[in-house]
Amino acid sequence: MPKRKVAALEKVEADLVNLQYKIRRDPKSYAQEFYDQWLAYDAQRQIFFSSPATASSEDIKKFHDLVDLVAHVADLYPDITAPFPDHLKQLLTQHHTTLDKDLREKVVGSLVLLRRKDVIDSVSLLTTLFPILISSPSKSLRTLIYTKIISDLRESNAKATNHKLNRTIQTVLHNLLTSDRTSSKGLWACRITRELWRRQIWTDARPCDVMKEACLSDNEKVVVGGCRFFLGGDKEREELEDEESDEDIDLKKVKHQSLINKKTKKRQKAYEKALEKIKKQERKKHAPHPLNFSALHLINDPQGFAEKLFQKHLQNLKNKFTLENRLLVLQLVTRLVGLHKLTVLPLYSWFVRYLTPKQLNVTTFLACLAQATHNLVPPDVIEPLVVKIANEFVSEASAAEVAAAGLNAIREVAMRQPLCMSETLLQDLVLYQKSKDKGVMMAAKGLQSLYREVYPEMLQKKFRGKEATMGLRAGEIKPLKFGEEEAAEDIEGIELLEKYKEEQKKKKVEQGEGDGENKDGGEEDEDDGWNSSEWEVASDTSESSGGWIDVSSESEDEGPAKKRQRKDSGAEEVPELVDTSKTNGEVQTNGEAKAGSEARPNGTAESTAEAEARRISKLATTTILTPADLAKLKELRQQAKLDKMLGNTAKRKKELIEKHIEDGLTAEDIELPAQLGKKATKEEKLERARENKPSRDEHKSTQALRKAKKEAEGKSSTNKEKARKKNFFMTLGKAKQKQKRSLVETRKALRAHIKRSKAGGRRRNGQ
């Protein structure tokens, strides 16, 4: 075979690569050779600065290789290559539109390489690349620069947050949006901010201020980008975390493969690398998680922002946004109003013209109206809208889907402001539970169930239900007035702990009566957590600090055990109420109070309320809660929540909505009751059946699927499976030999089998 002739350019390229390798190994010895190449680079640079568009392909190739060489060894000769970064910046800034594509990408890559070698800092790199990102007409160059900017910011914030760099870039993005509000260049600011927020590199309020300016821009695309950031940025974060968790390495599988496969250095390194990655993931999981607030919570001055957004993009008649984009802005405004409980009264009158069944995307308008409602919105402002929905949507002439959507929208509004409608309108709407359509019936029943919980007085007696009627009579249900907030008066769940302690006392008393006299003379020590075996040291100062401890006299201790026990058990049942306003001779006991309760009904209710308040706060004011008490209190709270969730569907639904109020409402939530009466088509049933099931190209048996799963995990078949699939003629010899064995040989084989099984098989896995 004849020897191939090597072209001159290939020789130069090979020489430069070889020179780079030698310089990396011994910089001092090859300083002169590098200086010669530096002079060649400088000459080519001057040619490119004079006329970059007219350069030949050979010159471009040569300059490309020289830039690559200098960039890789610039950190070894800092004195010679000091002007090199400025040369690249100047070349890229002035001639990025006329440079060759490959050379342009090499210059960008060389700047990034210099940043990684700490020849230049991140601020210098990003301030060079960002103007080119905005102004370059080349899509490939913009994509490359965007990728480099994101990766550099990620690396700069990898070990610790680089606040100085972040502030600089955020200021650049903010100025880009505010300098020209009509330009579409601000779209890059939205993309960069959204990506860094999604990756949790920027988590403070400054990126939210940048996106606020994007929402107030005059360019439609920039406004849409800003609105989508606030409406969907947190969901993107969660999806990214789920994707990262799916990529976790299976340690069990890696260990299994390392035991089965042949031991090589490559596999050992791969195993160690996977092990290190798993340890890093574990450290990340157990590390203290920083507070991760939603972007909507970090907005400065949400009231002013919501008002500006509404006036500029919704109330302004000159605005030419499409309906879809206006709905995005509306969703953001209503989310802000509902989340921060803002007062934007013109917003509610703006809704009136859109609340008709013929309006396009009317369910989205209904969902936004419900989002914008909260308990501090005046009922006089909301009531006309509810009446409009009832008149337009809920009538005998309306279609079932329309009526169901209207009733559900009214229910969502009433859930946030129960005073939004009159009793007459509520009675008319509740009567729709007799409708033949299932969706309308369920929507009306949902409205009735809601008012049974929050405002049963507005319902007729026959619609209130048993629990609401009993709660009204007992005074347990107290509807809140407009502007009134339900404040906590005691420790959450303290009554559960008090009830638990009373039950424990009663159990001890019953056990004491069954066993006869107590060995300790009838004295019962209350196990309040300090006397438990779990706590070795108890504090005596807490007992002597207050004046709440009952000390029994000697005469009581000397008395019979049964009398004291009867006395104690009687004292534990119900404490007598004493009217302290009377003199000692006119003390009124609980029994006398009960006798006179019929003559004074109002006084009885007041005294009962006072007694209830004293009873609830008794444990918190007279007892120091121990760690055991607090642990039990937490357990009782969880059990009470579980009972409530399993018991009452309406309460559960209300609590879920209050819990996820930040998620906002969608058109699907409003349309949900209308779907109840519909029969699913065959295609919908098949699609529902295929959900959460692996896609199968062909039908396979369970064993085949199990085998495929096993092979995917890198596991081989068992010895039992191998023996079963073995050729019959290959097993004949062993079978014949088994039959000819003597008893001694059989005994040896059995003993060897037992010994191997105890040792963990032939591989001795048990040792």
Swiss-Prot record:
Required for 60S pre-ribosomal subunits export to the cytoplasm. May also be required for 60S ribosomal subunit maturation and accumulation. Pfam families: SDA1_C, SDA1_dom, SDA1_HEAT. Keywords: Coiled coil, Nucleus, Protein transport, Ribosome biogenesis, Transport. GO terms for biological process: protein transport; ribosomal large subunit biogenesis; ribosomal large subunit export from nucleus. Associated with the 60S pre-ribosomal particles. Residues 504-521, 680-701, 710-721 have a biased composition (Basic and acidic residues). Transmembrane segments: none annotated. Belongs to the SDA1 family. Residues 749-767 have a biased composition (Basic residues). Signal peptide: none annotated. This is Protein SDA1.
